Amino acid sequence: MADGDSGSERGGSSGGPSGFSQHMSREQETQELASKRLDIQNKRFYLDVKQNAKGRFIKIAEVGAGGSKSRLTLSMAVAAEFRDYLGDFIEHYAQLGPSSPEQIAQASGEDGAGGPGGPRRALKSEFLVRENRKYYLDLKENQRGRFLRIRQTINRGPGFSGGTGGGPGLQSGQTIALPAQGLIEFRDALAKLIDDYGGEDDEGMGLGSGASGGGAGGGGMYGELPEGTSITVDSKRFFFDVGSNKYGVFLRVSEVKPSYRNSITVPLKAWGKFGGAFCRYSEEMKEIQERQRDKMYDRRGPGERGGSLGPGAGGGGDDSETEDVDDD
């Protein structure tokens, strides 16, 4: 995808020559690092990793059968949260049984409208807030099947004339609909791009308008958050990332191996308990290891211990050592 296509949601329709020149300048400064195409049912999805002076970010575009396009823009930090949320939706979708005809009819045409435009029953919903951006995730169904609807809205602020409707400073939202059968493929492709191009230096969003993801200064309504970090043990790497959503502040701990990735999310109110549990187990394991070393030492014969345990053993050496100390 060309930068001109994937960057069009960043206020390209701003009025006046100066707005156009600023838009073109931003486009020229943006580099595309990687692109992945997914064909799911009759739709095409593009995942593009881009970079500008503010950092790296991911653009997601849906191209329908008629060529219509919808785009979302995610910081690397928000993309990581999306990846984990997708895992939750995948698990929920796998537990759902088949829909009955009555449920499908109710989901698609409660008001008699029928067809794809009618109301749709939400099976699971989540949302994220990142300063001037909001992301809504809804697992829904209609007569064509189940799908994940992802909607992004951007508040440009009172001083921005976006020219896209919705009131002063408010840009109309962008929405993509991902067929449920493609959730795993989409999640895996996103995870691969994050693994290959994400990093500690990409916590900020390269999106302009003061938006930022997790990490210091990116806590949205919660203000500044601690920086993420990582540790490497053998072939594993553990990432610690602090974020926030509608439920509050949380710590996401991700375990990453070359062919495996898993994560847990710990709410802020449980950090102290988790820390206390880790410290307690660390101390207990130290005591267990010391007892095991003592038992192994006791099993050894006098010769294996160095021959200097008994009261008379090595006495000459002890006297010599004492004399040296006295001489000093």
Swiss-Prot record:
GO terms for molecular function: DNA-binding transcription factor activity, RNA polymerase II-specific; DNA-binding transcription repressor activity, RNA polymerase II-specific; purine-rich negative regulatory element binding; RNA polymerase II transcription regulatory region sequence-specific DNA binding. One of its GO terms (biological process) is positive regulation of transcription by RNA polymerase II. Its main location: nucleus. Transmembrane segments: none annotated. It is found in: Nucleus. Residues 27-260 are annotated as: DNA-binding. The modification N-acetylalanine is found at A2. Keywords: Acetylation, Activator, DNA-binding, Nucleus, Repressor, Transcription, Transcription regulation. The keyword Acetylation applies. It comes from the Eukaryota. Residues 24-35, 289-303 have a biased composition (Basic and acidic residues). The keyword Transferase does not apply. Residues 9-18, 304-317 have a biased composition (Gly residues). Residues 1-35, 100-124, 289-328 are annotated as: Disordered. It holds the Pfam family PurA. One of its GO terms (cellular component) is nucleus. Residues 318-328 have a biased composition (Acidic residues). Belongs to the PUR DNA-binding protein family. Transcriptional regulator which can act as an activator or a repressor. This is Transcriptional regulator protein Pur-beta-B. It comes from Xenopus laevis.
